[in-house]
Amino acid sequence: MSDRFCKECNNLLYPKEDDNTLFLACKNCEHIQEAKSHRLYVKNFRPKHASIELYARDLVQDPTLPSVKINCGNCGFNKGLYFQPRGGEEDVALSIFYLCCRCYHLWT
């Protein structure tokens, strides 16, 4: 049985903190056990090439991305970001993408 379920009644265990120690507690039978890991939830963010447009506004706000003076073909603004997406496809991984800081237009 997984450590996410109560060993006594098989109900789901919920995180509970006491004295800076993480426990997993059952709300049904009050069984408590110390958590094996301090990690409660993991969210892996691995966007695909087609979804870059969905998070373009977040990319513009990222101060770690390098900026470049380049004219946008969509609105003519002269500041953009450039980055190399991490993807499984070799041809995408070798491309450099530019993103307009004003209209969020994306081009290679």
Curated annotation (Swiss-Prot):
Binding site for Zn(2+) 1: 6, 9, 26, 29
UniProt-recorded name of the protein: DNA-directed RNA polymerase II subunit RPB9
Zinc finger (C4-type): 6-29
Subcellular location: Nucleus, Nucleolus
Stated family: Belongs to the archaeal RpoM/eukaryotic RPA12/RPB9/RPC11 RNA polymerase family.
Organism for this UniProt entry: Encephalitozoon cuniculi (strain GB-M1) (Microsporidian parasite)
Record text on subunit structure and interactions: Component of the RNA polymerase II (Pol II) complex consisting of 12 subunits.
PANTHER family: DNA-DIRECTED RNA POLYMERASE (PTHR11239), DNA-DIRECTED RNA POLYMERASE II SUBUNIT RPB9 (PTHR11239:SF1)
Keywords from the named record: DNA-directed RNA polymerase, Metal-binding, Nucleus, Transcription, Zinc, Zinc-finger
Function: DNA-dependent RNA polymerase catalyzes the transcription of DNA into RNA using the four ribonucleoside triphosphates as substrates. Component of RNA polymerase II which synthesizes mRNA precursors and many functional non-coding RNAs. Pol II is the central component of the basal RNA polymerase II transcription machinery. It is composed of mobile elements that move relative to each other. RPB9 is part of the upper jaw surrounding the central large cleft and thought to grab the incoming DNA template. Involved in the regulation of transcription elongation.
Gene Ontology BP terms: maintenance of transcriptional fidelity during transcription elongation by RNA polymerase II; transcription initiation at RNA polymerase II promoter; transcription-coupled nucleotide-excision repair
Zinc finger intervals, TFIIS-type: 68-108
Entries under InterPro entries matching the protein: DNA-dir_RNA_pol-M_15_CS, Rpa12/Rpb9/Rpc10/TFS, Zn_ribbon_RPB9, Znf_TFIIS
SMART domains registered for this protein in UniProt: RPOL9
Organism lineage: Eukaryota, Fungi, Fungi incertae sedis, Microsporidia, Unikaryonidae
